[in-house]
Amino acid sequence: MNINKQRVLDEFFELIKIPCPSLGERQVADLLKQKLEELDGKVTEDMQAAKALNGTAGNIVADFTGTVAGAPRILLNAHMDCVNPCAGINPRMEDGVIKSDGTTILGGDDKGGVVAILETLRCLKEQNLPHGDIQVVFSVSEEQGCAGAKNLDTTLLHSDIGYALDSSGRPGKIIFAAPGQNKIFAKVHGKTAHGGVAPEKGINAIKKAAEILMDVPTSRIDEETTCNIGIIHGGSATNIVPDLVEIAMDCRSRNPEKLEKLTADIVAAYKKGGEKAGVPVDVEVKPSYKPYCLAKDSKVIRLAAQAAENLGLPVDITATGGGSDSSHFNGFGIPCTVLGTGMTNVHTVDEILLEEDLYMTCQWALDIICLAAKQ
């Protein structure tokens, strides 16, 4: 019941070399469809998500019939897209550490998870290992607010529990709780005028926005609640008084009541700030996903923890402040945890992945499936 380490490494290098920005996953999606079909999977491309997002590919869903009746049906998830810069990745190995050449990301987020799922499927087939039904979901656009999973055609899903292989932290890390997220968009309106000829006839939306933002909650609110002002757009030229500023932020909490209150407080702060500044402010709230909290003794957590212990891995059952596709799977009614894959310094050109962690993630995923078939 052992993985093929050389095959894992070769496939990881193969996949990370394919450019796959969010909404541009077509090339890697075609390759993964081929690989899944070669493993006897019933493969479906979820075009509902592709159309909703106007992307080049949809989520890839593949079903594999189990050999053990009554075993839990398990969903395995990883995402196909990467953040930029992800074109021209030139991987290298130095003393057991996989890294890029420093001009791009590495792509372990989340090709490490993709490779682990593929290797698990191969080992099950080649070694005739007992297993229950398996459903693989390779999602698109995870790096853009988990948009692929959010727009997934849920009629395709029929799993009992799920594992998203998509967390920083070494194998053995198991996420039992994650926050819900709301995105908040505000438009601060001013009045345009010539900045040199008649600035007093204008109302500077940038200055007004700055005044308003002084009273908008931000950063860490408490141990499980945060909010962040992430994007501000405004102005078109230095000699024009800007008449519009657009602000985007998100707020998160693992407590649904706290998330609701923080969202309401932010909206109220914008409205009150606009009244105080004497300018109109439009505010829109877009819920992204709901928080979840899995019992530490639930089946999905217990299986992952037992498999990790059997491999001698230190088990770390913990909460996170980040979102992932698992948030949506839990929302769809499938208890789903996130597993640590060893990805480090993600979303930067300093990203690395220990060779040992790449292999161990594959072995851990395989052992979870085999352990589930025995229970």
State each model region's role.
Residues 1-26, 287, 344-348:
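N-terminal capping segment at the start of a domain
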Residues 13, 17, 228-236, 250-251, ...:
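A short beta-alpha structural unit
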Residues 29, 56-57, 63-65, 69-138, ...:
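Active-site metal-coordination/substrate-binding segment of hydrolases
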